[in-house]
């Protein structure tokens, strides 16, 4: 069982929550990014640096993830790939991606991409709030307790 983190865009506060949980439980935690990341010195926590390029980190995670694993990402297509392989996925706010809702989420993402490509200004997500951080930590603890 491994927690894979799409780390290029992962907020620092979420990385910190993940590291504390991994240190507490001993679960394997892997941050995948195309930049150098500093992680705590622990045998179960590591950073995997991949070459720069479009979706290189995502492709590496998709190649390695297993059905017993958890993915932490804000990337809906990557979450979809993880779910297809039987893994579970959470976003930074603690919302679980599910097989029942991923198709609708992909459709909405594609629609918003189309709007942006046509010049329509769309709002990005709001900054993470304290409630978001707590929701993420709560959902992570629930996942860890099931293991």
UniProtKB/Swiss-Prot annotation:
Q: What Pfam family is a match for this entry?
A: DUF188
Superkingdom assignment: Bacteria
InterPro entries xrefs: UPF0178
Leader sequence range is: none
Return the similarity comment: Belongs to the UPF0178 family.
Classification via HAMAP family: UPF0178 (MF_00489)
The name of this protein is UPF0178 protein CV_1768
